[in-house]
């Protein structure tokens, strides 16, 4: 560590204020704490470096000496006045961490109750199931307490013993000597894996784990109005806790299939309905499909293509139970691509009656028409 820049370790520039040092330490210590990075040796070493840097930079006298001489001078022996024990007796950095976070992580080192891990499961729903709600039965695989050993991990009739390496704490303390003095750090005990206990005769069913993998069927009530991206928490349905800790939670991720006719936007439903040119001009009554069934709706005369009408309360029920969204019907007026002579004559008459001027070629006999007549 002596070859490293303590400021750089905390992501700071030299001369950083006390508040900046504290904020940087808090952020990095939470990120690299062993409890959040179990089995990650790189994160464990990073955590040690972070605490070592903070022990120096948080102490005014040590910080002043460090700022004056720099880490390179320590390596060259220019700081020999401190010797190897200038800062001995500093204690473990877990005390520093606990002073910041109230001992929230220390309970694990003392083998206190530990909450079980959370689980996730994705449920696929049809459009209608999401709108009206549905009961689903899912099957998940999770750890369950071993029935053979009642979760102890030890063979029936035997018991676990306190780890003789860590004394039951689950952590071992390691002293590191640097030019700034002796630093005491802790790491997970490699003999008991942090449990503080060792099992001489493990259970033959769970092989000492205390848990076994089992498939479990769970019925879940999915409320009306859910949509893709919604997450439903099922409390206590996750992995079992340790040392009497609570179970984790199961989070149900919702995924809704699209519909061939309906488009959902929030709690509103959108649909397109096609009508003919004549019906748009004269008005008509159409049958509109909704999630509740078909309804009749009158289209007024002179409706323009793209006009949108609202069917109040025909949308998706709100998850909180306060009413429903609306359904919006967008009318598309279909213009015929080809018409016969009778239809053409009627349209020309309509335009003339409306006072519209015909185009230069509209309604006139074409050359092709004249040629056809000459052969009749």
Curated annotation (Swiss-Prot):
The CXXCXGXG motif repeats extend over 146-153, 163-170, 189-196, 203-210
What are its GO biological-process terms?
A: chaperone cofactor-dependent protein refolding; DNA replication; protein refolding; response to heat
Q: Does the keyword Cell division apply?
A: no
- GO CC, one annotated term: cytoplasm
Residues bound to Zn(2+) 2 are 163, 166, 189, 192
Gene3D superfamilies for the chain: DnaJ domain, Heat shock protein DnaJ, cysteine-rich domain, Urease metallochaperone UreE, N-terminal domain
For this UniProt record, the keywords arranged alphabetically read as follows:
Chaperone, Cytoplasm, DNA replication, Metal-binding, Repeat, Stress response, Zinc, Zinc-finger
Which cofactors are named for this entry? Zn(2+)
**Which is one GO molecular function term here?**
unfolded protein binding
| Residue ranges covered by zinc fingers (CR-type) | 133-215
According to the lineage, what is the superkingdom? Bacteria
Localization in the cell? Cytoplasm
Domain J as annotated: residue spans: 5-70
Q: Which residues bind Zn(2+) 1?
A: 146, 149, 203, 206
Cofactor binding note of this UniProt entry: Binds 2 Zn(2+) ions per monomer.
User: What does the domain comment read?
Assistant: The J domain is necessary and sufficient to stimulate DnaK ATPase activity. Zinc center 1 plays an important role in the autonomous, DnaK-independent chaperone activity of DnaJ. Zinc center 2 is essential for interaction with DnaK and for DnaJ activity.
Assembly and interactions?
Answer: Homodimer.
Q: What does this protein do?
A: Participates actively in the response to hyperosmotic and heat shock by preventing the aggregation of stress-denatured proteins and by disaggregating proteins, also in an autonomous, DnaK-independent fashion. Unfolded proteins bind initially to DnaJ; upon interaction with the DnaJ-bound protein, DnaK hydrolyzes its bound ATP, resulting in the formation of a stable complex. GrpE releases ADP from DnaK; ATP binding to DnaK triggers the release of the substrate protein, thus completing the reaction cycle.
**Family (UniProt):** Belongs to the DnaJ family.
Put simply, this protein is called Chaperone protein DnaJ
Q: Which organism is it from?
A: Clostridium novyi (strain NT)
Gene behind this protein: dnaJ
């Amino acid at each position: 560590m002596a070859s490293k820049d303590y400021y750089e370790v905390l992501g700071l520039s030299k001369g950083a204020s006390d508040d900046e040092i504290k904020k940087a330490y808090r952020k990095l210590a939470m990120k690299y704490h062993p409890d959040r990075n179990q089995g990650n040796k790189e994160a464990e070493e990073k955590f040690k470096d972070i605490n070592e840097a903070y022990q120096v930079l948080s102490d005014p006298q040590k910080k002043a000496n460090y700022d004056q001489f720099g880490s390179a001078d320590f390596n060259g022996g220019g700081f020999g006045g401190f010797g190897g024990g200038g800062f001995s007796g500093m204690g473990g950095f877990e005390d520093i961490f606990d002073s910041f976070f109230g001992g929230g992580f220390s309970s694990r080192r003392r083998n206190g109750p530990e909450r079980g891990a959370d689980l996730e499961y994705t449920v696929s729903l049809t459009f209608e199931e999401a709108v009206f709600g549905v009961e689903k039965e899912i099957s998940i695989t999770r750890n369950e307490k071993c029935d053979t050993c009642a979760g102890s991990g030890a063979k029936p009739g035997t018991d676990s013993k306190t780890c003789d390496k860590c004394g039951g704490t689950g952590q071992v303390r390691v002293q590191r000597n640097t030019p700034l003095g002796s630093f005491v750090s802790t790491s997970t005990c490699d003999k008991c894996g942090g449990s503080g206990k060792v099992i001489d005769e493990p259970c033959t069913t769970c092989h000492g784990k205390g848990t076994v993998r089992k498939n479990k069927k769970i019925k879940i009530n999915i409320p009306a109005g859910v949509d893709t991206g919604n997450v439903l928490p099922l409390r206590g349905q996750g992995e079992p806790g340790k040392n009497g800790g609570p179970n984790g939670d199961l989070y149900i991720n919702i995924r809704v299939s699209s519909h061939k006719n309906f488009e959902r936007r929030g709690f509103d439903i959108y649909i397109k309905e096609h009508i003919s040119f004549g019906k748009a001009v004269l008005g008509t009554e159409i049958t509109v499909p909704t999630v509740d069934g078909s309804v009749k709706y009158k289209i007024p005369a002179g409706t323009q293509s793209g006009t949108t009408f609202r069917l109040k309360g025909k949308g998706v029920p709100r998850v909180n139970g306060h009413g429903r969204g609306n359904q919006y019907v967008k009318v598309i007026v279909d213009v015929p691509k080809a018409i016969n002579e009778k239809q053409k004559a009627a349209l020309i008459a309509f335009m003339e009656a409306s006072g519209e001027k015909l185009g230069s070629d509209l309604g006139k006999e074409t050359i092709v028409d004249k040629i056809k007549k000459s052969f009749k």
